[in-house]
């Protein structure tokens, strides 16, 4: 049974199969009856709730409030911002009818042809259009601004090639939509959110990020500028973990959203939008986990510590239960999520493998001999090491160990990124190095033509122009034309 629990395809054999095995065997998610859509199982959803709760708190600390807007968007709304819809047109799911009926010749349920909608409805791929149509009703004066709204919702983008958490036809996310009186204020908002995302991913997910701006080719449809946080996964591929868009006045003009400024003149509103999704779950899984299962950062683990009793008989189990209860209460006083698994239908070895697979940061083993000696065994998931300590010190020790694990897995990820970031000046060398994965820092002449040629020939894209990168000018590795600074190239999810 233990072997069955831990049977994951090794990453060295296939990182793709390893990932899928892990998501399913760790009870995070599974494929549904609807192609491209997933069922997020309770354990996976508990992790998402931790992500959601912390981000929601960070948004509210900066003055944002939550609201909810319709799932359905009239098709005519999307026509108002042409470049915006162009970016999503091939992925849109469309509602054309509003009723079903029984087939008169007995072939089951069919669409009622007489129930065709006067205007087709798009199931939201993103909410800019429906929200800006609403903002037109809300915004009249500078006194109505700024509007700082976030919504937690699901969206649909009809992806053809799907993968659990990373790319699905329906996914969960948050999307922020703000309105401002000035360009400067909107840009400040865009960068503020970028910092929130970066801080969250680094401090809670324990994943180092690079903050940057997208090239025009990679920019969000309808945005003036798209800022992003880029991460590097263990398999050498990049993953975009979040985006924050400065929309300029594009949507305000498309939906005629104007306000009366302090001088009594009418002008268009300035806007931002920003979002992260359940794709963060994919990043969390891929970044830290190993062939034994999940490795979760303690700050996002639904269960941070599991206690497993090892008893010879029922009498000794009762003694262990009593001691474990005291330990649990001490942990709860420190707001540590702890589970005591004294179920008798599975052996300790099975439990060890199960909780290792699920990435519980710390496992405590408490046996009859431990009670006699006043000790307890402590196992940490990130290093798979164990030690025996005094049971009287376990609360403080484990609390400090959780912090150490959080820092250790971040440092491990940071070391990996550093070891897999290279500087390249020659295109032939670039084509060789891109096969090895990782971030490649190379000069780019700033043209879409060069960017597209490199993408076509190598499948590598410009992940971002780093905001805090080296701005030393140079020569484009492909064209020999002048370059303002190095950018990050990588193959990506």
Swiss-Prot record:
GO CC field: aminoacyl-tRNA synthetase multienzyme complex; cytoplasm
UniProt xrefs under InterPro entries: aa-tRNA-synt_IIb (IPR002314), aa-tRNA-synth_II (IPR006195), aa-tRNA-synth_II/BPL/LPL (IPR045864), Anticodon-bd (IPR004154), Anticodon-bd_dom_sf (IPR036621), Pro-tRNA-ligase_IIa_arc-type (IPR004499), Pro-tRNA_ligase_II_C (IPR016061), Pro-tRNA_synth_II (IPR017449)
Provenance organism: Azobacteroides pseudotrichonymphae genomovar. CFP2
Catalytic activity: tRNA(Pro) + L-proline + ATP = L-prolyl-tRNA(Pro) + AMP + diphosphate
Keyword Aminoacyl-tRNA synthetase applies: yes
Repeat as UniProt keyword: no
Residues of the signal peptide: none
SUPFAM superfamilies registered for this protein in UniProt: C-terminal domain of ProRS (SSF64586), Class II aaRS ABD-related (SSF52954), Class II aaRS and biotin synthetases (SSF55681)
Cystine pairs: none
Pfam families, A to Z: HGTP_anticodon, ProRS-C_1, tRNA-synt_2b
Protein name, UniProt field: Proline--tRNA ligase
PANTHER family: BIFUNCTIONAL GLUTAMATE_PROLINE--TRNA LIGASE (PTHR43382:SF2), PROLYL-TRNA SYNTHETASE (PTHR43382)
Subunit structure: Homodimer.
């Amino acid at each position: 049974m233990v072997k069955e629990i831990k049977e994951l395809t090794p990453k060295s054999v296939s990182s793709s199969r390893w990932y899928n095995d892990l998501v399913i065997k760790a009870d995070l998610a599974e494929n549904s009856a609807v192609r491209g859509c997933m069922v997020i199982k309770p354990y996976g959803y508990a992790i998402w709730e931790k992500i959601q709760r912390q981000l929601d708190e960070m948004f509210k600390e900066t003055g944002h409030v939550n609201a909810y807007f319709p799932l359905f968007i009239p098709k005519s709304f999307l026509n108002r911002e042409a470049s915006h819809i162009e970016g999503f047109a091939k992925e849109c799911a469309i509602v054309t009818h509003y009723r079903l009926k029984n087939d008169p010749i007995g072939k089951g349920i069919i669409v009622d042809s007489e129930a065709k909608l006067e205007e087709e409805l798009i199931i939201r791929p993103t909410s800019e259009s429906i929200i800006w149509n609403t903002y037109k009703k809300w915004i009249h004066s500078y006194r109505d601004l700024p509007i700082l709204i976030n919504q937690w919702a699901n969206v649909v983008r009809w992806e053809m090639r799907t993968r659990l958490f990373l790319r699905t036809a329906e996914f969960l996310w948050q999307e922020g939509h703000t309105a401002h009186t000035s360009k400067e204020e909107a840009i400040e908002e865009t960068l503020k959110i970028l910092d929130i995302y970066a801080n969250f991913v680094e401090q809670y997910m324990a994943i180092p990020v690079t903050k940057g701006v997208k090239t025009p080719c990679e920019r969000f449809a309808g945005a003036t500028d798209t800022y992003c946080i880029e991460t590097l996964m263990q398999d050498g591929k990049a993953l975009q973990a979040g985006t924050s868009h400065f929309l300029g006045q594009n949507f305000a003009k498309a939906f005629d959203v104007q306000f009366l400024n302090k001088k009594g003149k009418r002008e268009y509103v300035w806007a931002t939008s920003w979002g992260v999704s359940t794709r963060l779950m994919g990043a969390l899984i891929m970044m830290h986990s190993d062939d034994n299962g999940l490795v979760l950062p303690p700050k996002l683990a639904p269960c941070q510590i599991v206690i497993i009793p090892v008893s010879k008989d029922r009498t000794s189990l009762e003694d262990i239960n009593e001691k474990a209860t005291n330990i649990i209460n001490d942990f709860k006083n420190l707001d540590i999520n702890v589970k005591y698994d004294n179920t008798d239908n599975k052996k300790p070895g099975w439990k060890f493998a199960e909780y290792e697979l699920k990435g519980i940061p710390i496992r405590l083993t408490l046996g009859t001999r431990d009670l006699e000696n006043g000790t307890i065994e402590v196992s940490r998931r990130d290093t798979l090491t164990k030690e025996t300590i005094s049971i009287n010190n376990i609360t403080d020790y484990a609390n400090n160990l959780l912090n150490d694990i959080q820092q250790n897995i971040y440092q491990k990820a940071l070391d990996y990124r550093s070891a897999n970031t290279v500087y390249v000046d020659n295109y032939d060398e670039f084509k060789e190095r891109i096969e090895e994965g990782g971030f490649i820092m190379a000069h780019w002449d700033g043209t879409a033509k060069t960017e597209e040629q490199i993408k076509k020939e190598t499948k590598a894209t410009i992940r971002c122009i780093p905001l805090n990168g080296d701005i030393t000018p140079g020569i484009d590795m492909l064209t020999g034309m002048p370059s303002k600074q190095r950018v990050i190239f990588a193959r990506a999810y």
